[in-house]
């Protein structure tokens, strides 16, 4: 094997401890895979080594002309480079490896995937039989992947292990495989002889799968060649040295595409195993707190919310996207922008998304995309369209740090007079030739010819914070039109910056109650602050629970208030920092925030995690709903379901599952629910949640007529039927006429942005009105010149004859909080207005929630103006019910 000169600093070959804030040079490698690179183990290794180093001998035989590398941008070649580097390779970087060697010769001659994969069964028959006996009952194609274990680890694992060591960098790369161990011939010569590639008869070891679950897996290699994995308690281990010799992957893909799924959902697919959402963990490393979202996982709301809750700040998105510029009925870069790009904007703590996109044809299956490094949007002008500020067929945006090229530049760069439709039509004309154009002159050719896909390497230096301070302070202020000055609820931070997250609010009379969770030691604790003067100022925050400070992880508190009493619920982790077992807790307080009694446990089982509890009062009785993982699905995976309970006497009614109905076959392993909302009154309890039963995220609703003891039929609220819709975070409000108002974050029609949508039920939730967009972000929108923006996290409140709404909105660049009202029961909404007072500042305002009391709308949100996340609030006069007293002064 060819090697470059030794790394100058030997210390780079060991895993350094987690460091303070500093720059990391991040690379996205979007290579083109070719059958020629999988003839021998050396061919595959040479391809990857040539991508890493432009000085690799005969590089032009493996890499397209003009493609950058990694090595020339590392120390000592670049003395100005940061000391740490992270290199991300695409999803399916190990797919072609199944063709390696004499056993893959027949498969390499095929012209389709359906010809190539079955051609491997005969040459791998002995290994197939071994795993059939060891793991009976597995789908045939999954057993084939098990039979391929030695080939895959010999090629993929050893290549990237050695490249990480050689270059002293962190490398993330992805293949379809099960966890494995290396077996030495001295230990078990017969097993090694059985599993070892016959092309290497003198090799003194082989790799054996130790699980039947061959899965789409990302491996994060440290500079010493070890794979970094989580211990489930927030600590990062090295594999195999700290995992009993088993080589484990860092992250397993949870939400499989149809072609990846096993029967009966898909009979001609890869039959991969599903990862558990609960097992997707953040890796704390010197290059950031890494979270990996493999392709479809980047769009999944529960996956991303969990990573946010676990403190991720660097998102790795290995991709094998199926098309890019082939069709105009849905624009693939727009669909792609819904995922990792949008989530970096949505979650203020996320600093960067590294998207490495595979290109090239795998027989008749094609992959294409533009690798990119994505940061946070700003209020700055992105400037004219360029190769560096948009994917093809899109308008310029400020979120791009680096973008790989496509086979042709966007024609709008050279001719700004072109409409968006004209630009996309020209791009599609070029893109179709990748599928049906004339043959390319060779396999590395780029351009408008069959399989002329472009590969690329892009990089950027990114400052990664350690600790709660994530940005520079924002001193800019601008008075909103109707809301008063924004004020910090979460109190002074005498011991240094503390990050506060996920605020919620309730109000009753002159009292306003805000709750949130904040980091204390290694875990989060729930806090509450009380205002006794209509939100003018808040008293010192206090712990909610009776747990010792920092002893138990407490997250996502929610609060409800009635005259003379408030109730606060929160989730606890029941096994250290693991989210595999949890509790839902409730505490009651008097109107001044003084605790009444002890903490009470709401859920009735130790099985499974518990997430996102919500509380409301039915009369003077608390009712609660939450996400509960006690139920198991296929592959014994825990599923996220909606459970509810009602306070009774000194305890609670038996927990009852509120969601009902069978999932479609594609969602059988993924019958998950998320982000419940609750409202109650008159003995009725109303729930809404996001639901994946249809292999899309929809908003579903259920009503209980007996105070939460049982629930009726589930009703779908959103009315869009297109594929891969993503609707989340519902909010509910009830009015005196018994109407149910619902709003949610809505992603429909394969558009690149989310909006706030609204529907109303006039029959208690039996059916809902046609959906309509609540926010006005698209008024005056010109698709030829304007860039779509995102609206998230709606919160509804009803008072008198008016419906009020607040939400997170980045129409101005970065996140702000906006507000509107409807005086006619949701038929029309007033023009939206700003809530926060940061004007044109760079800070982020996110996750708002609203409450109404005595003529005032109170909004709380998460705010980074101080450099770390704090809880802020603002208020404005809002319509009061007739005859209900005077409005206090704002």
Predicted features by range, described:
Residues 156-172, 189-200, 207, 289, ...:
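CN hydrolase (nitrilase-like) catalytic-core segments centered on the catalytic cysteine
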């Amino acid at each position: 094997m060819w090697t470059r000169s030794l790394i100058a600093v030997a210390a780079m070959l060991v895993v350094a401890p987690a460091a303070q804030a500093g720059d990391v040079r991040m690379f996205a490698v979007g290579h083109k895979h070719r059958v020629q690179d999988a003839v021998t183990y050396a061919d595959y290794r040479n391809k990857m080594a040539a991508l890493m180093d432009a000085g690799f001998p005969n590089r032009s035989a493996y890499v397209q002309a003009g493609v950058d590398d990694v090595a020339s941008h590392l120390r000592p070649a670049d003395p100005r480079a940061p000391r740490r580097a992270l290199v991300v390779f695409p999803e399916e970087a190990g797919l072609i490896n199944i063709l390696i060697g004499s056993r893959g010769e027949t498969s390499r001659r095929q012209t389709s995937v359906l010809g190539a994969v079955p051609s491997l069964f005969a040459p791998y028959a002995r290994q197939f039989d071994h795993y059939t006996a060891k793991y009976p009952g597995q789908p045939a194609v999954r057993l084939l992947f098990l039979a391929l274990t030695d080939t895959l680890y010999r090629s993929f694992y050893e290549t990237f292990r050695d490249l990480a060591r050689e270059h002293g960098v962190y490398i993330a790369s992805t293949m379809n495989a099960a966890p494995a161990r290396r077996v030495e011939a001295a230990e078990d010569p017969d097993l090694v002889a059985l599993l070892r590639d016959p092309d290497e008869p003198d090799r003194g070891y082989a790799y054996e799968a130790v699980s039947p679950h061959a899965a789409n897996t990302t491996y994060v290699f440290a500079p010493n060649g070890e794979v970094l994995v989580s211990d489930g308690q927030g600590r990062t281990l090295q594999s195999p040295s700290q995992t009993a010799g088993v080589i484990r992957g860092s992250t397993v893909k949870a939400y499989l595409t149809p072609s990846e799924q096993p029967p009966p959902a898909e009979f001609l697919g890869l039959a991969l195993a599903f990862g558990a959402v609960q097992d997707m963990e953040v890796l704390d490393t010197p290059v950031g707190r890494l979270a990996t979202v493999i392709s479809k996982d980047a769009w999944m709301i529960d996956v991303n919310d969990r990573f946010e809750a676990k403190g991720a700040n660097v998102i790795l998105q290995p991709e094998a996207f199926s098309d890019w510029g082939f069709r105009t009925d849905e624009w693939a870069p727009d669909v792609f922008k819904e995922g990792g790009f949008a989530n970096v904007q949505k979650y203020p703590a996320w600093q960067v998304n590294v998207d490495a996109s595979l290109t090239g044809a795998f027989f008749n299956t094609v992959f294409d995309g533009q690798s990119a490094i994505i940061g946070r949007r700003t209020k700055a002008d992105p400037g004219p369209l360029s190769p560096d500020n948009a994917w093809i067929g899109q308008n310029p945006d400020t979120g791009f740090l680096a973008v790989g090229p496509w086979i042709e530049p966007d024609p709008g760069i050279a001719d700004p007079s072109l409409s968006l439709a004209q630009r996309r039509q020209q791009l599609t004309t070029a893109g179709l030739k990748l599928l049906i154009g004339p043959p390319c002159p060779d396999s590395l050719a780029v351009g408008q010819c069959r399989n002329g896909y472009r590969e690329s390497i892009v990089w950027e230096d990114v400052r990664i914070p350690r600790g709660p301070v994530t940005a520079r302070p924002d001193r800019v202020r601008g008075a909103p039109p109707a809301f008063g000055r924004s004020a910090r609820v979460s109190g002074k931070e005498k011991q240094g910056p503390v990050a506060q997250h996920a605020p919620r609010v309730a109000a009753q009379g002159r009292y306003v109650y805000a709750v949130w969770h904040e980091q204390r030691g290694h875990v989060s604790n729930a806090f509450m602050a009380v205002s006794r003067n209509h939100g003018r100022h808040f008293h010192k925050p206090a712990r909610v629970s009776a747990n010792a400070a920092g002893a138990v992880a407490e997250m996502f508190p929610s609060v409800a208030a009635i005259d003379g009493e408030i109730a606060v619920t929160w989730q606890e982790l029941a096994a250290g920092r693991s989210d595999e077992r949890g509790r839902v807790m409730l505490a009651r307080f008097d109107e001044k925030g003084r605790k009444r009694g002890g903490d009470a446990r709401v859920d009735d089982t130790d099985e499974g995690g518990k997430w996102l509890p919500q509380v409301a009062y039915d009369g003077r009785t608390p009712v609660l709903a939450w996400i509960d993982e006690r139920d198991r699905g296929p592959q014994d995976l825990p599923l996220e379901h909606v459970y509810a309970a009602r306070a009774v006497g000194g305890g609670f009614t038996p927990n009852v599952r509120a969601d009902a109905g069978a999932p479609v076959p594609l969602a059988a392993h993924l019958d998950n629910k998320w982000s419940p909302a609750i409202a109650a009154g008159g003995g009725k309890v109303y729930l809404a949640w996001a639901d994946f039963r249809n292999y899309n995220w929809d908003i579903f609703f259920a009503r209980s007529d007996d105070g939460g003891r049982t629930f009726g039929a589930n009703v779908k609220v959103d009315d869009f039927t297109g594929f891969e819709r993503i609707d989340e975070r519902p909010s509910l409000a009830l009015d005196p006429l018994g109407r149910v108002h619902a709003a949610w974050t809505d992603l429909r029609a394969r558009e690149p942005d989310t909006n706030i949508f609204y529907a109303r039920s006039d029959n208690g939730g039996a059916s809902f009105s046609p959906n309509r967009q609540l926010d006005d972000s698209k008024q005056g929108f010109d698709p030829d010149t304007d860039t779509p923006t995102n609206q998230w996290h709606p919160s509804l409140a009803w008072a008198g004859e008016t419906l009020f709404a607040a939400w997170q909105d980045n129409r101005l660049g970065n996140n702000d909080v906006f507000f509107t009202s409807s005086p006619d029961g949701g038929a029309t909404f007033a023009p939206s207005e700003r809530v926060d007072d940061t004007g044109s500042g760079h800070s982020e305002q996110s996750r708002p929630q609203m409450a109404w009391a005595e003529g005032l709308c109170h909004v709380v949100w998460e705010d980074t103006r101080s450099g770390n996340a704090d809880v802020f609030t603002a208020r404005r006069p809002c319509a009061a019910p007739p005859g209900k007293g005077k409005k206090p002064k704002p």
